[in-house]
From Swiss-Prot:
Molecular function GO labels: 8-oxo-7,8-dihydroguanine DNA N-glycosylase activity; class I DNA-(apurinic or apyrimidinic site) endonuclease activity; damaged DNA binding; zinc ion binding
Keyword tags: DNA damage, DNA repair, DNA-binding, Glycosidase, Hydrolase, Lyase, Metal-binding, Multifunctional enzyme, Zinc, Zinc-finger
Reaction catalysis annotation: Hydrolysis of DNA containing ring-opened 7-methylguanine residues, releasing 2,6-diamino-4-hydroxy-5-(N-methyl)formamidopyrimidine; 2'-deoxyribonucleotide-(2'-deoxyribose 5'-phosphate)-2'-deoxyribonucleotide-DNA = a 3'-end 2'-deoxyribonucleotide-(2,3-dehydro-2,3-deoxyribose 5'-phosphate)-DNA + a 5'-end 5'-phospho-2'-deoxyribonucleoside-DNA + H(+)
Family: Belongs to the FPG family.
Zinc as UniProt keyword: yes
Signal peptide span: none
One of the GO biological process terms: base-excision repair
Taxonomic source organism: Pseudomonas putida (strain ATCC 47054 / DSM 6125 / CFBP 8728 / NCIMB 11950 / KT2440)
Protein name, as recorded: Formamidopyrimidine-DNA glycosylase
Length: 270
């Protein structure tokens, strides 16, 4: 699943080619995504100029002169720019045609993504209750410490809760906990303020590094400019269960936490 760095990489890839451009037509070949694509999307968006492309959590907000297209990449979706008129292949569900001669093409084999329309996107039900962005000053270790008090759940699903902080998905939660030396199974409410301060720093560092390097390469992810990211080669623990820790050599263990695989080092993480 594309996580926050992958979505931000997509935003950075497509924004320069969309902002200031006028939409000439919207072609929808299959409306059956996680939520159906609005029947009148072509009418609403065609003829409008795209003002900006923003990101909130893992949602992309394509802001037109009136209204916003809210897009989510789901489990395996991607947005990329192609030449106008390029024939569509299987799973290529939407084309947003631009007067520049390019198209923004949405591909989603599993159809678990979304393309919705809103006149007030930040108050849309999907975005309204989201926590702060992890790379802003609204998120820090003190927030983690305060929200964790009395919580018996494991720390990993706690930091993956979008009401606590957005965009800390499985890959980056795993890596940040390793960098902070915290066992992902530990009870969230039992972790000290000092350790949460360290964890928040590592969450910011890991996410910023992934964004800077183009996002993590996953089998189904393609960046907005058609190029995959390349951060996976630097992962310390994610996807490496049973292999030696890159720091101490201890065999990494894999467990299930909240229905997700979690890899950790029993020596480096306490």
């Amino acid at each position: 699943m594309p996580e926050l760095p992958e979505v931000e990489t997509t935003r950075r890839g497509i924004a320069p080619h969309l902002e200031g451009q006028r939409v000439s037509r919207v072609v929808v070949r299959d409306r059956r995504l996680r939520w159906p694509i609005p029947e009148d999307l072509d009418v609403r968006l065609s003829g409008q100029r795209i003002v900006s492309v923003e990101r909130r959590a893992k949602y992309l907000l394509i802001n037109a002169e009136v209204g916003t297209l809210i897009s989510h990449l789901g489990m395996s979706g991607n947005l990329r720019l192609v030449e106008l008129g390029l024939p569509a292949a299987k799973h290529e569900h939407v084309d947003i045609e631009l007067e520049s001669g390019l198209m923004l093409r949405y591909t989603d084999p599993r159809r678990f993504g979304a393309m919705l329309w809103s006149l007030d996107p930040l108050n849309h039900e999907l975005l309204l209750r989201l926590g702060p962005e992890p790379l802003t000053d609204l998120f820090d270790g003190e927030r983690l410490f305060q929200l964790s008090r009395g919580r018996s759940m494991a720390v990993k699903p706690f930091i993956m809760d979008n009401a606590v902080v957005v965009g800390v998905g499985n890959i980056y939660a795993t890596e940040a906990l390793f960098a902070a030396g915290i066992d992902p199974r530990r009870e969230a409410g039992g972790i000290s303020r000092a350790r949460y301060l360290k964890l928040a720093i590592e969450i910011k560092r890991v996410l910023a590094a992934a964004i800077e390097q183009g996002g993590t390469t996953l089998r189904d992810f393609i960046g907005g400019d058609g190029q995959p990211g390349y951060f996976q080669q630097e992962l310390f623990v994610y996807g490496r269960g049973g292999q030696p820790c890159k720091v101490c050599g201890t065999e990494l263990r894999e467990v299930k936490l909240g229905q997700r695989a979690s890899v950790y080092c029993p020596r480096c993480q306490r």
